[in-house]
C-alpha cells in the first residue's frame, strides 16, 4: 500500500493530494493555477539571479 502525499497549494494553502486525481497539482484548482501564472506573467515573481545586462548598464555590442 502506497503512502498518500499531501502538499499545500502554493497560492491559497489548501491541502492537495498529490496524484492523478489532482490534475492541477501542486495547485488545488485551475483558479489558483491561473492566479499563479498571472503573477509570473506580470513579473511579480522571479527566480533569483544576477540581473540581466542591458544597454542601460553600459554594455554595447561596439565594445566587443
Curated annotation (Swiss-Prot):
Cited InterPro entries: DNA_gyrase_inhibitor_YacG, Znf_NHR/GATA
GO molecular function, one term: DNA topoisomerase type II (double strand cut, ATP-hydrolyzing) inhibitor activity
UniProt region (Disordered), positions on chain: 45-64
Binding site for Zn(2+): 9, 12, 28, 32
Annotated signal sequence range: none
Cofactors named for this entry: Zn(2+)
Stretches with biased composition (Acidic residues): 54-64
UniProt entry keywords in alphabetical sequence: Metal-binding, Zinc
UniProt subunit comment: Interacts with GyrB.
Function: Inhibits all the catalytic activities of DNA gyrase by preventing its interaction with DNA. Acts by binding directly to the C-terminal domain of GyrB, which probably disrupts DNA binding by the gyrase.
Official protein name in the record: DNA gyrase inhibitor YacG
Species name: Vibrio parahaemolyticus serotype O3:K6 (strain RIMD 2210633)
Gene name of this polypeptide: yacG
Amino acid at each position: 500500500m502506497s503512502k498518500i502525499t499531501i502538499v499545500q497549494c502554493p497560492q491559497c494553502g489548501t491541502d492537495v493530494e498529490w496524484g492523478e486525481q489532482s490534475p492541477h497539482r501542486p495547485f488545488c484548482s485551475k483558479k489558483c493555477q491561473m492566479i499563479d501564472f498571472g503573477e509570473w506573467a506580470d513579473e511579480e515573481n522571479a527566480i533569483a539571479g544576477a540581473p540581466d545586462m542591458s544597454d542601460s548598464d553600459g554594455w554595447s555590442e561596439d565594445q566587443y
